[in-house]
Amino acid sequence: MSDLVAKTAIDRRLADIVTPVIEGMGFELVRLRLMSGKTRTLQIMADRPDGGIVVDECAEISTAVSAALDVEDPIEENYTLEVSSPGIDRPLTRLKDFDVWTGYEARIETTELIDGRRRFKGELAGTEGDEVLITIEDGRDSYVTIGLKFDWLADAKLILTEELIAEMLRQKKASGNFDESQFDEIEESEGEEADEAEQPPTKH
């Protein structure tokens, strides 16, 4: 079964290099993307297994990953390395994510049309085998739970809600890395910016 952590061939190669480094530090790789542009950007999202990663830990991961990439040298051009937390309205990239975040709202997009649509919005209802379960609106005041094969998914992301913010605050407190100032302006914005550490453009 595939996942949404790394989609392209180069992303998967990079993930193979950095995953052991990240996991060896006690974290998990959530998503990896090598973005094009004037200077290429390697974007890495990582988190604690129980959530609550902070910016200092992102910086530590960035340093370790940069050293590993120096050895392997998989990217020919100069690039910038960015390591961040998934943020509150995080992407869902692994089948297990849909179990972890059961009961929270999400948006899911599929690669092909499913019953005439590609986009689904609703409450996550866990998984069943290789299917993601989501409860969606089916007419006025009527809801139905459907199953989407994980391999059909092109993108999936949590929707920012008060319940989700409360859960993220709980994770931060449980991790011992709670900084209330990080959440002061959440109600005034559409989403929470992720903790992030950036390495300057470099050639590895």
Curated annotation (Swiss-Prot):
Residues 176-204 are annotated as: Disordered. It is found in: Cytoplasm. SUPFAM superfamilies: YhbC-like, C-terminal domain, YhbC-like, N-terminal domain. Disulfide bonds: none annotated. GO terms for biological process: ribosomal small subunit assembly; translation. Keywords: Cytoplasm, Ribosome biogenesis. GO terms for cellular component: cytosol. NCBIfam families: PRK00092.2-5. Belongs to the RimP family. This is Ribosome maturation factor RimP. It comes from Cereibacter sphaeroides (strain ATCC 17029 / ATH 2.4.9). The lineage of its organism: Bacteria, Pseudomonadati, Pseudomonadota, Alphaproteobacteria, Rhodobacterales. The gene is rimP.
